[in-house]
């Protein structure tokens, strides 16, 4: 009987230790699978209150897990570092306004989960890897989205872009008009307006000459770049 009681006691002790071990595992901090290796991005994120271990992996606490939108405006962060934002499990939107970006923004640097991006107050003209355009022998175009963007805020210079932005707009016009996609562009005053394809031609002589020869391209006194792209 004494041996049996000792056995029961040892079994109970082992069971308690097992529960304690499981509890300690559940309470252990969780970190991202990959590390943030870019020192500039690491500094920015630490300043915003995110924590990292000695290997650069981010602590997945309530703050990190609840982050669905991240404001990196004015940080001048290198676009090459944006891929590292995949450490956020629920990040969907990025504010990259006023970062001094010029000429070209490459959408391939964005983590796959990003669906919204603010690029206002930058000097971006080209938008690489937003769409893939395939032109058939008969001139027909197939436009394939390369990133699942449903919210896009553009700087004023985007109004001159036909190669990517206009085609992105044309491909998604019904969704934009229906309100399931939000695409806006800054006007000359810096305010955001719903994206459209009407463009002013300030030079009156040139405008009248174009209207005389290409009347089908115009809506009032403005040229419609959507029409010009179909010629």
Regions found by a protein language model. Give the residues of each.
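Short "repeat-start/strand-capping" segments in structured domains, especially the N-termini
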Residues: 90, 112-113
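Bacterial N-terminal signal peptides that target proteins for export
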Residues: 1-9
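Low-complexity, polar/charged sequence tracts that form flexible coils or short amphipathic helices
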Residues: 85-86, 108-110
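N-terminal capping/linker segments that flank leucine-rich repeat
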Residues: 2, 22-93, 123, 134-135, ...
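C-terminal motif of bacterial Sec signal peptides marking the signal peptidase cleavage site
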Residues: 17-21
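Right-handed parallel beta-helix
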Residues: 99-101, 111
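Alpha-helical adaptor scaffolds
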Residues: 95-97
């Amino acid at each position: 009987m004494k041996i049996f009681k000792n056995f029961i006691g040892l079994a109970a002790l082992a069971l308690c230790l097992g529960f304690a071990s499981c509890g300690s595992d559940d309470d252990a901090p969780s970190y991202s699978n990959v590390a943030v290796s870019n020192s500039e991005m690491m500094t920015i994120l630490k300043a915003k209150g995110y924590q990292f271990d000695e290997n650069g992996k981010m602590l997945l606490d309530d703050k990190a897990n609840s982050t669905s939108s991240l404001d990196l405006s004015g940080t001048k962060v290198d676009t090459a570092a944006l891929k590292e934002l995949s450490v956020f499990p629920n990040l969907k939107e990025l504010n990259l306004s006023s970062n001094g970006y010029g000429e070209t923004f490459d959408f391939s640097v964005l983590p796959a989960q990003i669906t919204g991006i603010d690029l206002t107050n930058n000097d971006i003209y080209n938008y690489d890897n937003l769409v893939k355009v395939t032109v058939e022998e008969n001139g027909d175009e197939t436009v394939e989205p390369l990133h699942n963007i449903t919210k896009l805020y553009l700087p004023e210079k985007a109004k001159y872009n036909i190669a990517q932005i206009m085609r992105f707009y044309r491909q998604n016009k019904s969704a934009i008009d229906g309100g399931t996609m939000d695409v806006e562009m800054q006007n000359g005053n810096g305010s955001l307006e719903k994206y459209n394809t009407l463009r002013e031609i300030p030079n009156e002589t040139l405008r009248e000459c174009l209207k005389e020869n290409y009347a089908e391209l115009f809506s009032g006194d403005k040229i419609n770049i959507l029409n010009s792209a179909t010629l």
